[in-house]
Swiss-Prot record:
This is Tethering factor for nuclear proteasome STS1. It is found in: Cytoplasm; Nucleus. It comes from the Eukaryota. Belongs to the cut8/STS1 family. Keywords: Cytoplasm, Nucleus, Protein transport, Transport. One of its GO terms (biological process) is proteasome localization. Residues 20-35, 276-290 have a biased composition (Polar residues). GO terms for cellular component: cytoplasm; nuclear membrane. Pfam families: Cut8 (PF08559). Residues 1-75, 269-290 are annotated as: Disordered.
Amino acid sequence: MNVLLSPQPPLFQHPHETNRISPSRSLSPFHNMSTSRKRKADEDGDEMSMSPRSSPAASSRQLQRPSKKVRSNELVGRPLTLPRLLETLDPTALRTVLERICERHPDIGQEVVNSAPRPTVAAAHGVLQEYQDKMKAAIPYGETSPDYTYYRVKAPMTALIDALLDFTPQYLPPNETQTTVSLQYMDGATKIIHALPDWEPQQYRHHKENAYDEISKAWALVINEAAKRGGGLSLHTGGWDQTLAKHHEISGGRMGTAMNAMATSVSWMAHGGSSNGQQPGNPSSDQNSILNQLMSGTYGAPVRVGPW
């Protein structure tokens, strides 16, 4: 009798089928667990590699400390920087450098002229005093011939006179509008001219005489301009008429041009200053000046005539 049996897999499998695994069947549940763990570990590794914190570049940046300015141990010759170079220059060298730059670049020179402050009277007198000191230092010691002394002093003396004549237009109208400033400069400049040597040979005296002539014209220009403002009242009240008279006396009468301008400007204040032979600004003539009469309240009062 035939017995119907359910089909069963053969007891022995083909020798080549021992390594074949069915895709629908897994070997064991532990195999799936290990596979999932391995995949998860791989994914975690990928995520860590994708993270900016775990990147080598980020770690190297975090380890870097802020850089400090460290002087190089290697000594290399190099020129000074501009600020350090300027610190080494004295005023004379600095002026020389600036003059050369302005000569090569006129626009820079004009910018310096426009930006520099106006020179004060004290500053101008200080520069002239330096030239005067150089002239005095050139005078030889002991008894020397006039010719030798003149040629020793000629260069610094000429430099002094040239500087004085160059500074003078700065303080003349219309460049200088304040009469007092102009007169203060010329007062100091005239004193410097007084100190120039009086050479024994007549042919060497032209330097000083020319300087007197130029400064006298400058005085006259300022006096005439001041006379247009208040009739020259500031000249008399400031005592400049007396100052000029003293300069005229010290110069030996070489300030005639300035004295004539002053006499014309203050003639209405000092009657008899020229009629009685007295110079304007003398104390005796001040007694009859209109200004003093106005100040004392006697202007216009009747004048007594006769012995009583």
